[in-house]
C-alpha cells in the first residue's frame, strides 16, 4: 500500500507560554529566526538586529515562564542565539556582534535567569560576523581590525577574519564551564557557520573574496579533521585540525598547499544552505538540490518543481526518513533522497513557515515518541509534524508485548500440560515472574541514544586521554602533553567516587605532576580571589563533598595514600603556602554535615595541621594563620597564646578585634589573656588603646579591678615609692585610668551606676567633701 505524506498537528500553540506573542512574531516577520530546543519543549524566536521590539522570545510548553527581551534603539540586539544540548536542564546562549556571550538557563529557579557572561573577543577591536553551536562548543568567525591592514575591498581586508572555538559545558546545578579559546583558522575570509550534529560547515558569504568563494570547509571535531572542498571543481582534501593538540591553520597557506583549489572559478550561487545529519544541503537559484557529504563529495539529490523567487524568497530544507522536505513560500515538496523522485507536493495555507529539527534522540516527551525522527513545521496556525502515514492495518508490537510473546513460546516448550499458554495469562499470573520483571524494566528503560547523551562527556574525556597517550608515546611535545594528561586525569577523577584505586590514582598524579594537578583542581573548584583578597568558589556542592570527605571507618586507605583534602593541602604547602589558610577557611564555609567540616571527626584546620607535620616541627607562620582563620575558639586562643609568647602584641590584639559580635565569649577570653600580660609588665603599654577597644562592653570597673588583682604579681617585700634599678615598673593608676574610663563610659551609657567608681570617673569637676579637722 502506498504511503502518503501527512501534516499532523502537534500543538495549536495554546500550550506555550506567551502564545499570542508567539503567533504574532511567526506571522508578522518573515526574517525572524526560529529554533527549537533539543527536548522539543521550547521555541526560540530571534528578530534580526534593528527590528522592532521584542527582539527575543523564548516560549515554553507546559509549566515554565517564557523569556521575552527587548533592546532599546541605539543598543545592539543579539546577533544569534542557540539552545544548548544539555540533558540536565534547558539552556541557551546569546551572542552579540561585539563578542559578548550570555548563557541563560531554566529549571534551576523560577523562569529563565542568566548563568554566565563572557567576552569572546576580550582584546577589543574585533567584530563577530557569524556564530554556531556544535555539541558543547561555541564557534565564531570574527573580523580583526580590517581597516588597519588595508583599505576596504583590498585582499588584506578581505582576509582579516579568523575562526575560533571555545568549549561550553554545564557545571553543577546552576553554572557553566568555559574552556580556553582556540583559533582554528586565521587570515581567512568572512565565512558563514552552519552546524549539524557532528560537523561544522564553513560556507562563503556575499562578502567573501571572489577568488575563494567557491571553497567550503567541513570541520569534524570528533575526528580532528577539516575537509577543504570545491564542489564545482570536484576536489576535496583532508587536513588535521584538532584544537586539543594546538592545531591551527593560516587559510592562505592552507589553500596554497592544496593543488587546484585556486583555479579560476565562479563563486557558488547558492540560495539556501541547510545542515543535516547526512551533510550540507545546497539549493541553487534553479531549484536544484545537492548534498555536500562529510568526505567532501557532492551529489545531486533532485530538482524542485518550483525555483526560489529571487535571492530574498523564503526557502527551508530538511530531511527525515530518507526524504527531502523543501518549503518554498507556501509550497511543501517531498523528494526521495535516493532517486530524487518527487513523492508529494502540498500547498500550505500560509507562506510564513519554518522547518524545525526533530528533538534529540532520547530527549523526546512520551507524546512525541510516535513522531520520532520526523521534521516539525511551525506557523502561526500551530506546530505540525511532517511525516509519512503508515499503511492501515500495520501495527508494530511494543517491547512489552514481544517479551510476553517470546516468554509464552519458551514456557510452552517446557510445559508438560496440554493447555495452550497465552500472553494474557502470563501478564496476570503470579507464577511467571521473570517476564513480568523484564517487561517492567523495559517500560522505563532509556534508549541507547539517551544513554550516549548522558555519557558524552565521559566518552569524550576517555577518547582525549587515549589520543594524548598516543601523542606522548610518539614523543611529541612531551612536557605540554604530560601537563594536559594530568589535568584531564584529575578532572576525570574528581567526577568519580574517590575511594580505592581512584584515590590512589589521584595521589599518584599529584606526586608526579603537582603543578598540573593543582591547576585542574583550581578549575574544578572554580577558585578565584575577590576584591578583598579572599578566596571564593562557584563549584557545586557535590564537588566540594568529594574534596572534603574524610576517611570512612573500615575503609582506611593504605599507608601513604592521602584523602583528597589532605592531598590538596600538601600540594599547596609545596607550591603556594600562602594560599593554604584561605583555602582551609573557604573549605570550612563550603562543608556540610558529614563532609569533614561541621560534622563528627577532626575539624578541617586540624586535618590541615596534620599535613604540616608534628607539633613543634611545623612552619610557625602557617600554623598561626591556620589557627587564626579556623574560627574555632580553642584554635584562636591557642594562636593568641603563641603570639603573646612571641610578644607580637599587634597581631594578638588584631585577632581579638577581628572577632564579630557573634563571639563575645572568645573576645572576653582574649581580653583576659592580654589583661594578665598588661598587669605583669609594661611591654603592652604602647598598645593600650587597642586593649581598651577589646574590653568587653558588659565589664564593670569593679570587675576589672578584681581581674587585675588576680593577675598582679605577688609582692616580695614592703612597697617602695620607686622601683628598684633594672626592675619592671609596676602598674600605676595613670595607666589604669584609660581602662577604667572605658568600662565606666560603657556602664554610664547603659543605665544606672554599676560601681562605686562612677562618680570619680564621670564628675571630676566636683571634689569630694572636705573631712572635718580634729582641733
Curated annotation (Swiss-Prot):
Clinical condition linked: Hermansky-Pudlak syndrome 6: A form of Hermansky-Pudlak syndrome, a genetically heterogeneous autosomal recessive disorder characterized by oculocutaneous albinism, bleeding due to platelet storage pool deficiency, and lysosomal storage defects. This syndrome results from defects of diverse cytoplasmic organelles including melanosomes, platelet dense granules and lysosomes. Ceroid storage in the lungs is associated with pulmonary fibrosis, a common cause of premature death in individuals with HPS.
Keyword check for Membrane: yes
Keyword Cell cycle assigned: no
Tissue-level expression: Ubiquitous.
GO biological process, one term: blood coagulation
GO cellular component: BLOC-2 complex; cytosol; early endosome; early endosome membrane; endoplasmic reticulum; intracellular membrane-bounded organelle; lysosomal membrane; membrane
Leader sequence segment: none
InterPro entries in the cross-refs: BLOC-2_complex_Hps6_subunit, HPS6_C, HPS6_N
One Pfam entry name: HPS6
Cellular localisation: Microsome membrane; Cytoplasm, Cytosol; Early endosome membrane; Lysosome membrane
Job description of the protein: May regulate the synthesis and function of lysosomes and of highly specialized organelles, such as melanosomes and platelet dense granules. Acts as a cargo adapter for the dynein-dynactin motor complex to mediate the transport of lysosomes from the cell periphery to the perinuclear region. Facilitates retrograde lysosomal trafficking by linking the motor complex to lysosomes, and perinuclear positioning of lysosomes is crucial for the delivery of endocytic cargos to lysosomes, for lysosome maturation and functioning.
Biological source species: Homo sapiens
SUBUNIT field: Component of the biogenesis of lysosome-related organelles complex-2 (or BLOC2) composed of HPS3, HPS5 and HPS6. Interacts with HPS5 and HPS3. Interacts with biogenesis of lysosome-related organelles complex-1 (BLOC1). Interacts with AP-3 complex. Interacts with MNAT1. Interacts with DCTN1 and dynein intermediate chain.
Keywords: Albinism, Cytoplasm, Endoplasmic reticulum, Endosome, Hermansky-Pudlak syndrome, Lysosome, Membrane, Microsome
GO molecular function terms listed in the Swiss-Prot or TrEMBL record: GTP-dependent protein binding; small GTPase binding
Protein name: BLOC-2 complex member HPS6
Amino acid at each position: 500500500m502506498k504511503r502518503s505524506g501527512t501534516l499532523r498537528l502537534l500543538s495549536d500553540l495554546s500550550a506555550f507560554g506567551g502564545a499570542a506573542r508567539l503567533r504574532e512574531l511567526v506571522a508578522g516577520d518573515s526574517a525572524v529566526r526560529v529554533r527549537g530546543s533539543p527536548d522539543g519543549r521550547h521555541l526560540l524566536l530571534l528578530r534580526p538586529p534593528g527590528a522592532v521590539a521584542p527582539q527575543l522570545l523564548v516560549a515554553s510548553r507546559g509549566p515554565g515562564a517564557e523569556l521575552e527581551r527587548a533592546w532599546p534603539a541605539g543598543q545592539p540586539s543579539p546577533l544569534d542565539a542557540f539552545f544548548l544540548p544539555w540533558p540536565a536542564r534547558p539552556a541557551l546562549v546569546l551572542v552579540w556582534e561585539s563578542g559578548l556571550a550570555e548563557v541563560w538557563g531554566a529549571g534551576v529557579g523560577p523562569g529563565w535567569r542568566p548563568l554566565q557572561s563572557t567576552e569572546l573577543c576580550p582584546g577589543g577591536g574585533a567584530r563577530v560576523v557569524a556564530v554556531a553551536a556544535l555539541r558543547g562548543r561555541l564557534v565564531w568567525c570574527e573580523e580583526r581590525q580590517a581597516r588597519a591592514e588595508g583599505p576596504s575591498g583590498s585582499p588584506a581586508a578581505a582576509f582579516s577574519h579568523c575562526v575560533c572555538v571555545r568549549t561550553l559545558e554545564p557545571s553543577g546545578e546552576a553554572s557553566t564551564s568555559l574552556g580556553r579559546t582556540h583559533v582554528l583558522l586565521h587570515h581567512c575570509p568572512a565565512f558563514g557557520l552552519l552546524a549539524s550534529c557532528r560537523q561544522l560547515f564553513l560556507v562563503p558569504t556575499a562578502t567573501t573574496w571572489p577568488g575563494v568563494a567557491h571553497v567550503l570547509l567541513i570541520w569534524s571535531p570528533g575526528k580532528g579533521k577539516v575537509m577543504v572542498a570545491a564542489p564545482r571543481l570536484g576536489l576535496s582534501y583532508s587536513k588535521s585540525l584538532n584544537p586539543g593538540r594546538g592545531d591551527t591553520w593560516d587559510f592562505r597557506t592552507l589553500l596554497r598547499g592544496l593543488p587546484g583549489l585556486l583555479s579560476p572559478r565562479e563563486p557558488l550561487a547558492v540560495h539556501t544552505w541547510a545542515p543535516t545529519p547526512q551533510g550540507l544541503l545546497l539549493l541553487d537559484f534553479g531549484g536544484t538540490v545537492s548534498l555536500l557529504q562529510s568526505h567532501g563529495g557532492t551529489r545531486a539529490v533532485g530538482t524542485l518543481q518550483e525555483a526560489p523567487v529571487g535571492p530574498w524568497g523564503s526557502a527551508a530544507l530538511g530531511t527525515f526518513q530518507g526524504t527531502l522536505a523543501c518549503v518554498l513560500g507556501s509550497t511543501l515538496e517531498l523528494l526521495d533522497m535516493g532517486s530524487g523522485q518527487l513523492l508529494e507536493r502540498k500547498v500550505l495555507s500560509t507562506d510564513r513557515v519554518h522547518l524545525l529539527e526533530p528533538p534529540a534522540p532520547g530527549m523526546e516527551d512520551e507524546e512525541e515518541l510516535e513522531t520520532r525522527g520526523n521534521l516539525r513545521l511551525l506557523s502561526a496556525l500551530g506546530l505540525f509534524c511532517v511525516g509519512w502515514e503508515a499503511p492501515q492495518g500495520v501495527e508494530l508490537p511494543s517491547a512489552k508485548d514481544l517479551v510476553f510473546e517470546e516468554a509464552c513460546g519458551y514456557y510452552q516448550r517446557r510445559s508438560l500440560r496440554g493447555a495452550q499458554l497465552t500472553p494474557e495469562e502470563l501478564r496476570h499470573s503470579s507464577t511467571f515472574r521473570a517476564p513480568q520483571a523484564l517487561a517492567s524494566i523495559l517500560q522505563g528503560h532509556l534508549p541507547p541514544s539517551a544513554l550516549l547523551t548522558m555519557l558524552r562527556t565521559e566518552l569524550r574525556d576517555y577518547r582525549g586521554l587515549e589520543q594524548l597517550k598516543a601523542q606522548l608515546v610518539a614523543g611529541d611535545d612531551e612536557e605540554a602533553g604530560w601537563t594536559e594528561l594530568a589535568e584531564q586525569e584529575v578532572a576525570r577523577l574528581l567526577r568519580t567516587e574517590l575511594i580505592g584505586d581512584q584515590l590512589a590514582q589521584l595521589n599518584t598524579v599529584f606526586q608526579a605532576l603537582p603543578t598540573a594537578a593543582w591547576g585542574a583542581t583550581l578549575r574544578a573548584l572554580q577558585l578565584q580571589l575577590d576584591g578583598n583578597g579572599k578566596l571564593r568558589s562557584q563549584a557545586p556542592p557535590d564537588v566540594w563533598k568529594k574534596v572534603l570527605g574524610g576517611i570512612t571507618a573500615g575503609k582506611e586507605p593504605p599507608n601513604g595514600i592521602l584523602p583528597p583534602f589532605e592531598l590538596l593541602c600538601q600540594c599547596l604547602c609545596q607550591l603556594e603556602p600562602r594560599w593554604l589558610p584561605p583555602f582551609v577557611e573557604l573549605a570550612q564555609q563550603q562543608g556540610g554535615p558529614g563532609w569533614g567540616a561541621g560534622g563528627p571527626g577532626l575539624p578541617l584546620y586540624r586535618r590541615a595541621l596534620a599535613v604540616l607535620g608534628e607539633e613543634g616541627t611545623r612552619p610557625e607562620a602557617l600554623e598561626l594563620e591556620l589557627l587564626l582563620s579556623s574560627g574555632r575558639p580553642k584554635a584562636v586562643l591557642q594562636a593568641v597564646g603563641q603570639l603573646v609568647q612571641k610578644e607580637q602584641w599587634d597581631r594578638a590584639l588584631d585577632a581579638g578585634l577581628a572577632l564579630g559580635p557573634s563571639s563575645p565569649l572568645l573576645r572576653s577570653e582574649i581580653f583576659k589573656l592580654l589583661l594578665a600580660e598588661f598587669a605583669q609588665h609594661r611591654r603592652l603599654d604602647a598598645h593600650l588603646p587597642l586593649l581598651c577597644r577589646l574590653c568587653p562592653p558588659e565589664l564593670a570597673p569593679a570587675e576589672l579591678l578584681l581581674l587585675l588583682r588576680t593577675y598582679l604579681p605577688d609582692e616580695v617585700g614592703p612597697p617602695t615609692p620607686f622601683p628598684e634599678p633594672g626592675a619592671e615598673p609596676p602598674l600605676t593608676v595613670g595607666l589604669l585610668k584609660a581602662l577604667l574610663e572605658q568600662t565606666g563610659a560603657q556602664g554610664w551609657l547603659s543605665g544606672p551606676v554599676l560601681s562605686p567608681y562612677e562618680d570619680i570617673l564621670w564628675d571630676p569637676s566636683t571634689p569630694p567633701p572636705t573631712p572635718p579637722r580634729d582641733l
